[in-house]
Amino acid sequence: MSGYYNRQYSHFHGNNDRYQTGRYAYQENGNRYKGFQRNGSGNRRYSREGFGSQLRNNENESRPIRSQSRGISEIPRNPFATRPVVSAKYDRDEFNTKYHYYDIVSKRLRNESSFKKWKSEKIPEHGYVTTTELIASDKQKPILMARQPEQTSVDPRIRPMNGDAVSGSISAKKRYRKLRSALVRNSRIPYDSFYIGPEPPKEIIVYPSASNQQPIAAALSEAIIKNYFKSFGEIAHFEQFMDPNSALPLYVYLIKFTGPVSQPDAPYKAAYKASEKFKDAPYTVSGIKFNVILNQNTVLNSIKDKLIKQNAARVTEVNKAKRAIAEKSSGQKPQVIRGVPYDLTQVVNNRPVLFVPAKITFYHRFNAADFRYQLRKYNWAKIIDHYTGVYIVFHDLENAKACLEYESGALVINSHRTHSPIQIEFTFIEPKRRLQSNITNQRDINKPRKIEYSSTEELLEASTKQILKDLHNIIKRDILRRLVGPIIFDTLNPANYPEVVERQKKLDDEKKKREESQKKTTIKAKPAEFDIFSLYGPASKTKKLKRDRKADLGKRHLYTEESPDHQRKKKPKVEHMSHLLNDEISTREDTVDSLNVGSNGENSPESSGYESEDIISDESKKQSSVITTPEEDLPESAASLPDERSKELLQYEGKYKPIASEFPTPVYPYDDFDLNKSKQLSLDKFQLALKDEEDFSILKGIVSEKSKDITTDYTPFLPYSMWKLYQQIEQNGIIRDNQIALNEKEFDSTLASTTGSFIADGFKKIPDKLKSSYLLHHRRLAQPLNTVHNHQEQNFMALNGTESTNQEADLEQDNHNASSRLNRVFQRRFQQDIEAQRAAIGFESDLLSLNQLTKRKKPVTFARSAIHNWGLYALEPIAAKEMIIEYVGESIRQPVAEMREKRYIKSGIGSSYLFRIDENTVIDATKRGGIARFINHCCEPSCTAKIIKVDGRKRIVIYALRDIGTNEELTYDYKFERETDEGERLPCLCGAPSCKGFLN
């Protein structure tokens, strides 16, 4: 090998010098190393052929040694025998012949001249790069392009500024790094016995968010918060904090979690989960938003202090506003407060009212709903939208004054006309200090007045005077009863005055004879006439039970003079109004029947509800005798009339004299005039109402009193005015007859135009009760309306009324009932076959599911209803207790139903199609349901709703309560709960005889 290297070294020497320094040299001259040698002086040295190295002590004694060729096989001497021969590992012939061998000495490739270049004409000189080319609207093709050496390289992952994709890039979109709002926290480390560091928090703080409306007026129960956070873990401690200044809740809650001993990480995990869940969105309950955080360090105290300071500042602002209002009101003149309109006095019932005038509500189109939402924090009773304005009625005076102080001038509502905020100012109408009723006043008057004494001596003196006064009254009464009374009675004894007694007896006998003779002559002249005290005939002879005699005493003396106190103490007969009306009708009918009973010998109905022992004997007497004055258990003074009264009765005409009948009858028959809404008689009916001179004289007196102040003389125009009125009455009668002939009913007078043009009147809402006068489907007739327009032969045949038609109809009804029963039998068999096939297949399938209710339903349809909007009608006769249709809809939970009901009310959907199955399930047919939802309410329904189970599921089914005819409307009772607020009640338009008037 060629080359050399020179290096000093040291080795151990035997003399005093421990180490001897030598020189190791190598030169690229082809000589080989011969090992360590000694010189002539005995010093050791290393040498090579052709180059010698001398030691320090004898450098001149070195002699050159020629190097031998590489091919000599002489093994070099190595005194240490540990250092290998220095040679190249790949310096061999088999490696030197290879092209890739690299000469480490010359630092070049061997045989470089025999190498070939790799460049070709197909490949660019400087290489190539890969890019893409657009071949379609959404497709790209990779291509090769020559690389330019002067072009700088670009990171293919970065999009350039011009927006074009770089060649070789992975994606054309620029990838942005996600923005961090905070440092990313490490994952939570579970807490156990090997946990290092402070204990993690296991308490959370629930406090109101700053976005809530202040102050928080909603009443929130602690149980709601506690029950909700119980879902995260077991709660060991729950605490609510109050404001120390006002003792009002701060709505700040401290919740501490716990867990079983086997799970030490459970409370910490529960607190962490609760805080993480509401980290971004607040916890909302009852309209109040709450933040949830972990209780760390002094967070709880800082939150409490902040809320207490806010409440104190709010109280300071309220007091300041109160003082400003007081100063303002003291400086202004007292405002004249108007009262409540007369038509609202009963509704308001002398309660405090806040009033907003109509000039504000009408112009900005405010209604009661706007104020109802804005004043929802206050305990108001009712909000009335009147034509004079809006009246807000409160239960008590405190809430009314609080609303006036805080909301008057501060309440802002957006105008529905200008869409700008309007400041509302209230006018306070204080309730009148009215006196109590007469009974209360009487009690207050009779109640002894409480007297206070300043000392004990005054009390003893007053007590002594009262005792002496009572003793004086007792002694006086005792003297009158024991001494004065017996002396007076003994003096006035009739035995002491026999002449006076005999004279009085004679006068009484003569008077009695005269009355009897007068009575007989009166009966012979007019056998059907007698005195006014005998109008009730033999019914008064009916004996009463002992318990009813006292109550009947007032009935016997019905026309006698009684004191007002006695009349006030008598209790009226308590009966339902419908029964009283029935009694009135029956009495009129029985009046005519009672006159025929005497001649025909039939039993007459008695006015009393009890039977007597001598009724049979009395009736036998009535059959054989002429009508006479019945005997009554009355004193003679009441049973007989004096001479003057008898002569006065004889002077009256026959029609004015009392008639012998069981019930009193009027002189003239009752004229039932058809009055309109104005309660005024027309001119012709008014003339018919004047029967005799007595009526005319009374009318003349009334008119003369009313016409005293009239100075104009209308006498010349009176004939023309009368003729014009008669012409108008006649024309109105012709119009009314034409309306009845065309529309089967007279138009309501309130529907007429007041200005002569309906366009000038503008739009107005017509009540459903008035629509029946001009809409056919709103008319309630005896027979069901054919609003479905089924052109069947049964309707035509039913109008003939022949016996054959009725028999055919009955036969058809029987056939229909039999066919419906057969249909149910076939459906049950079909259902059994399906169940058998399902069991044979071995799995459930919707193809084999059958709803039995759809097969059993009757043919019904919906059309315009006479009750309300749309109704459900039967297309064929339906027998009682038969299934009609299923109430189909969306099955939802109770909380969802409440939310939807509020949403429907806000959106303007007036009708409610929510039907409750049980406490947790409600059927909503508002947007997804069948035609069964069109069934209207009626107080006398023809159907009923039942909840049955079909294949294990609850269904709502409508059944018939009675036989239902063709084209008859189907109704059932909604059974709504009664509303306490009169303004929230819905009127019932069913038109049934027993209609309750309201749905709720």
Swiss-Prot record:
The source's domain of life comes to Eukaryota
Which keywords are on file for this protein? Chromatin regulator, Chromosome, Methyltransferase, Nucleus, S-adenosyl-L-methionine, Transferase
Enzyme Commission number(s) of this protein: 2.1.1.354
**Matching InterPro entries:** COMPASS_Set1_N-SET, Nucleotide-bd_a/b_plait_sf, Post-SET_dom, Set1-like, Set1_fungi, SET1_RBD, SET_assoc, SET_dom
Show the segment(s) annotated as Disordered: 29-78, 543-644
Any one GO biological process: methylation
List, in alphabetical order, the Gene Ontology terms for molecular function in this entry: histone H3K4 trimethyltransferase activity; RNA binding
Q: What are the residue boundaries of the SET domain, all occurrences included?
A: 858-975
The record, for Pfam families, names: N-SET, SET, SET1_RBD, SET_assoc
Enzyme class at the top of the EC tree: transferase
In this chain, S-adenosyl-L-methionine is annotated as bound at: Y974
Where does the motif RxxxRR motif lie? 824-829
List the catalytic activities from the record. L-lysyl(4)-[histone H3] + 3 S-adenosyl-L-methionine = N(6),N(6),N(6)-trimethyl-L-lysyl(4)-[histone H3] + 3 S-adenosyl-L-homocysteine + 3 H(+); N(6)-methyl-L-lysyl(4)-[histone H3] + S-adenosyl-L-methionine = N(6),N(6)-dimethyl-L-lysyl(4)-[histone H3] + S-adenosyl-L-homocysteine + H(+); N(6),N(6)-dimethyl-L-lysyl(4)-[histone H3] + S-adenosyl-L-methionine = N(6),N(6),N(6)-trimethyl-L-lysyl(4)-[histone H3] + S-adenosyl-L-homocysteine + H(+)
Subcellular location per UniProt equals: Nucleus; Chromosome
Composition-biased stretches (Basic and acidic residues): 549-566, 574-591
One Gene Ontology term, aspect cellular component: Set1C/COMPASS complex
Q: Where is the Post-SET domain?
A: 984-1000
The task this protein performs is described as: Catalytic component of the COMPASS (Set1C) complex that specifically mono-, di- and trimethylates histone H3 to form H3K4me1/2/3. Binds RNAs which might negatively affect its histone methyltransferase activity. COMPASS recognizes ubiquitinated H2B on one face of the nucleosome which stimulates the methylation of H3 on the opposing face.
* Quaternary state and interactors: Component of the Set1C/COMPASS complex.
Family named by the database record: Belongs to the class V-like SAM-binding methyltransferase superfamily.
Comment, domains: The RxxxRR motif forms an adapter helix that bridges the nucleosome and ubiquitin.
What is this protein identified as?
Answer: Histone-lysine N-methyltransferase, H3 lysine-4 specific
Organism whose genome encodes this protein:
Kluyveromyces lactis (strain ATCC 8585 / CBS 2359 / DSM 70799 / NBRC 1267 / NRRL Y-1140 / WM37) (Yeast)
